[in-house]
Amino acid sequence: MGEFKFQLVTLLKKNSLLKGKSKIKFIGEILAPMIVIGILFGLLYLSAIIQPDFSPRYASGFTEVVGRLKKLLVATNGPLVPYQQTIVNNLRKQIKLAHPDYTNEYIDQCFEIFQDFESMQGYFLDPENYRGVMGGLWFDENDYRYNAPKVLKYSISVDADYTNDNNIQISPRSDSQIYLRHYFTQIQTAVDQAIFMAQNVEIPMVVTGQRFPNPYIHLWQTWTDGRNMILKETGGIFITAAIFVGLFTTITNMVMEKESKILEAMKIMGLHSLPYYVSIAISSCYTIIPSTIIVIVVLKGSQLIWTTQWYILTIILILFSISLILLAFILSKFFNRSKFAGLVCFLIVLIMAGIGIAVNHINVSTTVKLIFCLLSPVAISLANYSMSMKDLELVKIVNPDWSIIVSENQVIGMLILDVVLYAALVWYIDNIISGEFGQSKPFYFFLTKSYWCKKNANENDLVDLSKAIESPLYLRKKDLDYNNSQDFELNEIHSSKATIQIRKLRKEFKTGDGKRVAVDDLSIDMYQDRIHCFLGPNGSGKSTTIGMLTGLITCTRGSALINGLDINQNIDLIRKNIGVVLQQDIIWDNLTVLEHLIFYAQLKGYSNLKEAKTEAKKMGIEVGLELKLHNKAGTLSGGQKRKLCLGIAFIGPNSNILFLDEVSSGLDPLSRSEVQDFIISKKKGKTIILSTHYMDEADLLGDTISIIAHGKLKCNGSPLFLKNRFGVGYLLTITKKSTEFNKDSVMEITNKYIKQAHILSDAGTELSIRLPMESLPMFSQYFKHLEDCKNQLLIDSYGISISTLEEVFLKIGQETLKSTPNFNDPAVKEALSTKSSGVKVGQQLKGLLIKRICTTKKDFKSFMFSIVVPLIILALGLVMYKNMRTIETFNDVTTPLTFSIDDYGDNIYVPWSISGQNQAIDLRIKNSIGKSNHSKLLPADELEDYLTLNYEGNPGAFAFGKTIIEDIEMLSFKVYYNRDYLHALPIYINFVDNLMLSNLGGVGIQTTSRPFQHIKSKFELATEKINFSAIIFFIILTLAAFALVVASHAGNIAQERAARIKRLLYISGLKKYVYWLSNLIWDYVLTFIMVIFLAVVVVIIDSKFRNQFPLFICALVLFVTAIIPLSYLFSYCWSSHGKATGFIFGIHFGIGLLMTVTCFILRIWVIKDDNDILQTITDIIDLVFFFFSPFYCFSKVMVIISNFPGTTRLGESYIANYWGIKFGLPPVCFLALHTLVWTIWIMVLDYYPELRGKYRKGRNEKSSPPPPSDEDSDVSHERSKVLSFETSNDPIIMRDFFKLYKGKGKAKDNLAVYNTSLSIPKGQTFGLLGLNGAGKSTTLGCLSGEVIPSGGEIFVNGFNIQTQRLDALRSVGFCHQYNSLIGLLSAREQIRLYCRIKGIEESKIQETVEAFIKMMDLGSIGNSNVAGYSGGNKRKVALSVAIVGNPSVCFLDEVSAGVDPVVARFMWNVITELKKDKVIILTTHSMLECSAVCDRLTIMKSGKMMCLGSIQHIKDKFGSGYSIDVKFKKEYLLSGINLFQKELPNAKLVDHHDLSASFELPNSLDSPIQLSKIFSIIERNLKPILNDYSVGQTSIDHIFLKLTNLNQQKIKNQQKESIENHIIDINNNNNNNNNNSYLKNHKKTTSNNSILTNNSTTKNFGSSNFLDLESDNTYLNNLKYLEDDDFNIEMPPYQNSLKKSF
């Protein structure tokens, strides 16, 4: 538990740092949920602010309407009978009384009399009449003529839509105020008053109608409409989106950590899955908690959710948030690439929430619904529905069946179950699905004993071979299955512990060609305190073996014990002691170096933060990053990143097993030297497994060397054993002076003295000859002859060494690999000489289109997501558009309805009151109303309170009072009506009038509503055949589908840019517009699948789109052509496919949706309000939206074609011309404009460097800085030649060129390349050497056009790279350091593509491709995707891409970085063969490579050229005779240097690593030293103390070290570290040593040597004297020297205590 807590805290700190470093992203994660909730709240708020009118409105007022505005139609069956005529006349009297100025003739015109209902309705339905009609009065019976019947029946007719549905009595929130608004009650009260007059009952009344006092006076009640229409249905989706949107980045980052191996690297170094997931969950809460709080505050604080308690809602949302986090973990496990992970997971979760909406409405038991709740988004939708229904039930809006509704408590139970289930699934899936990396357990792992009963590591678990010779795990000859067991050094007893024991380890991979064995039954032991080096060709199985040992890869068969624990069963325990450096950097770009080291220090065991910081700083200094501790890792160079990874591996108190996989790959000599020193200094107490391609590094560091090929162990032993076994003597290395060098002449002289001599290799400018050991006595004569004939034989220099590991490797490699390309093959010769026939646009376009076809075909998942998923979304939209039920927005029910209070039941009581101010009237009213059994008299001042409290079940009430109008006192009669009762208002008017007239006049009144047929309004006519919802959903889903597909296309562009594929294509001669044209064409083709599908289906299913097909297809095509280039532009904002796709989709869809919904709302308002001003404003808004979004342009066209309400102009009933200026033409024109603008913009953006270069030429150019005063004479001479135009015909010319990077903010400017003038003639290979940051890559970038120079001129092939970039790069090849290969193409497809890019004739492409495949020995893998190639094979493909087409200039950036010596020599031969007719510029960190292939070179430092010339010239100028490299025997580690300098007094120590040392032996002209004499001294006097040595002219390595200031201070530091780390070991060795004779003979001499005295001009640190000094005082003086000198060494404790005791 303690370890869990500690790892958790450490991870949380790291996560917090990462979030803190990405403030903008973090703010976006916080704002995104707020925006989602803001949209929900906005919709709800709009519904809440539209509240009904609770003020009284006149129900009478007939006389104010009729005549002045409207006519009243009157009809009966036949002519009006007298009594009916009396009623009509009384209506006329009412008008006359109200308007005395009206003439009788005018009043007569206010009425139209008909003799049947049909005639009256026909008049009303006439479009010319209906606007002037108030309504109709129909007398049902005409069998009475003079006397009134007992019940006078009449019907009122108005437009059916001006009444409520006569078939329904009660409907929540429907309201009967409609009868007030459309003159029904005005007619009713006037006719009733006319009947009163006919019966001589004179009671003038003013009737008003008023809704019941608002019972929903509380905040929670004001949301009722929004709750019912929005929250109840879609609330679950909004809540899910708001919370899960914060997990989008979490999922993407998790998958990216898995994809980049960071996660597995952390696990390898001891991280457990549980704290990792818990830390991610807690870190997710940084965004989830605010999101959840916002949701709770909005829902509960605003009282959207009322009935449900705070704590219930909080529990539900907390559980739901936890479940979403766990669900995100589950979903992320199914993605190995971050490409679409975040977006797909987001869509999946939203779909789950959408399923919840459907589950709410299906009529099944709660048990079934609870099963659906196993998906937590479904559960939140059900919970939201239940909570909303409870609130709606309180206001009687719904009457739910609770037996089929899941309750909140049930949801809480299911969410708890979900959390537990999801947590178990995370645990289970994490174990059985490892993804691309890591070990997968069997599906039944939890049933195995080994999983639950872990074995603990202890001392007894370690196999001590000194006591267990017969152990089954002990490696003996009988354990070896190899044919040549003599190639294996078997140590029967070893003093160290066997910490790693590998037995029969095997790994098989499934490939398209069947199974491929990567590691073939490997068995080997590795020991503590030793460095075990894995060597082998690329793809030999080294990294796979390390992967299996660290748990990164699952074993197919076999096993290994690490510290006594089985890797197949106890990998988690093993990892507690492991440190690892993978080939891929396991760092976060936004964390600093110090933050990385602190994090890993704490992760690996330093619980105290202060202690972790101290160790982190110490480690940062030890790996050479003391000046970069506070720099972000993303700003470090490649070498510095490797150093950081090295520090990460070694930091921690328990990192005792170290796996270093090509740790020094790509490092410059300085960095590599520092790394080697560091590894040596840390060896004690550790087992280090190192894989490398540097043989000198393996020789220097390795205690044991294992060489693997094709997964098999070829040999194993100490470096000395392997050299003796495979070297068989000495290696003579001759450097050729020119191409005329004749190796046969050299061999003739050699064989004259040494018969058994033979050529080992002939690569580039180096010839290696094997000299047998027994020929040693002939060396003096042989070298004397060789020296005499040196110039004649065209020998530049030569050196001799005892067999090297490189030789061993080459010898073994020759058995398994091809190391020399067959240049004599006619096909190869033809391929190498095949030149471009001229760049052809059509050919380039063809090549790029084939590339896109191949990558699309091979990346099926991406195709599914980018095309198939959008097609599904599109199909869903079409299905909804076709099948969604049309909802009528008007009432067309004409069924008559007779109003009666009895419709509300026999037990209904009508509350009423009377003011009591006129006793006579009050009495008459009481007598009339009191007769009813339904009435209930209340005090006037209590009525409204009563209605408020008794809202439910009361259809209506009324109150009598008085009012004064124009000094006339009149009876006031107010009807209160309940909103939920559709016809309450006319019913209660009829109820009162009927009772009063029955009591006072003896006649009853029966009023009936007999609606006219509905006359559709403009809006209704516009929507008559339109399905609102269908159109809206169709358009939204269409926008989503196209947004998704173009976002995916943009992701591909972002990926190619980030991988530098686009740059390589441009440098190779691709015309930029062809690149964009090819992408546009292919993306158009893919997108037009959707276009065709949409066009065909929509035309088939919908006549409107069929009729306007030209407009629709034109808009659709232009829409696609506009959004793709716009998406390309957006892609520049992101460097990963996944983030580009997700964010671009969000931008497109979000903006398009927002603008489209705004359009819907505005257009509906325009037509409903019939508002010309609003229409003009909306037109302007349209134009603004057209300008900003092509998505809105297309949605507008769809809106127009679908005849969405408001698309027609006011006053028009249809669209006469869909292409009109107010309709389809503007959006189509804007779409065309978008297409043009965005396409041109991406071109301009890409052509900007050329345009800028042409503009800057001669304008505002910065003057080059003056040449340095101490400039080398050769560099100065070259400058003079270039400036005097003596080299104007050379292919490469740099004239006063420099590059200045401007510092941002307070950062200083960085002059990356100083004033440089250089020319390179044809046929020359030019080497650029220098430390990281010296300016090599910047120089190469400027030469290739990637980087714009700050000043000066650069000419390539005679063209200015700034102003004539395309011409300059027409015949240029580039091999980038980062390969820049297309992973989904095979080697053949890759080379074929660049053949077309470079303009090779189509008829020659196939043979050229096959020739390159043959030359590069790629035949067996030529059809496999490059992504699966080893590093060496990738470099072969990259080199092929660079040289295909026989370019005149080749830039090779670290061409052999990370490849084994066999492949490296292979490449050197290729380069040597190619350079005959071209310029090759090579950057490299390999001095051996430079010596082998370069004709001329420069060493750069701080942007300046420190030297210039051929290798021999630089050796002659900066070298000083001979260089001697030696490797001492272990017992002479400290004394060897002094002993060596004793025999060769003039030898200067140049470099020192552990047992190895490099000396420089000056060779003055006065007394030159012969090579034969040097050999004689070494063989005679120094041989007993040496394991190995080599002698030669001063190497370029030594000169490099000298010119880059790798000087004496470094030597002192190296010696200091050697003393600290080896003094104990050597003392132990010395105690066990019998003092060999050589040491005895020299002891007196060495003891008299002062530690401060040296024959060399440099103060030498006499570490060797520690063993030879005879007195303790001398030893302590040495300690004092160490302490007082400028080394500032922190002495080991035992030394300090010893010193104090004296």
UniProtKB/Swiss-Prot annotation:
UniProt entry tagged with the keyword Phosphoprotein: no
CDD domains associated with the record: ABC_subfamily_A
GO molecular function ontology, one term from the record: ABC-type transporter activity
Domain ABC transporter: 500-735, 1292-1527
The UniProt record lists the keyword ATP-binding: yes
Keywords: ATP-binding, Membrane, Nucleotide-binding, Repeat, Transmembrane, Transmembrane helix, Transport
Region (Disordered): 1257-1276
GO CC, one annotated term: membrane
Localization of this protein: Membrane
Membrane topology: Multi-pass membrane protein
Residues the record lists as binding ATP 1: 536-543
Superkingdom classification of source: Eukaryota
TM spans (from-to): 30-50, 236-256, 278-298, 311-331, 340-360, 362-382, 412-432, 860-880, 985-1005, 1026-1046, 1081-1101, 1109-1129, 1142-1162, 1180-1200, 1225-1245
Positions annotated to bind ATP 2: 1330-1337
PROSITE patterns recorded: ABC_TRANSPORTER_1 (PS00211), ABC_TRANSPORTER_2 (PS50893)
One Pfam family named in its UniProt record: ABC_tran
GO biological process: lipid transport; sorocarp morphogenesis
InterPro entries named among the record's database cross-references: AAA+_ATPase, ABC2_TM, ABC_transporter-like_ATP-bd, ABC_transporter-like_CS, ABCA, P-loop_NTPase
Alphabetized PANTHER family for the sequence: ATP-BINDING CASSETTE SUB-FAMILY A MEMBER 2 (PTHR19229:SF36), ATP-BINDING CASSETTE TRANSPORTER SUBFAMILY A ABCA (PTHR19229)
Family assignment from sequence similarity: Belongs to the ABC transporter superfamily. ABCA family.
Name recorded for this polypeptide: ABC transporter A family member 3
Species, as recorded: Dictyostelium discoideum (Social amoeba)
Gene: abcA3
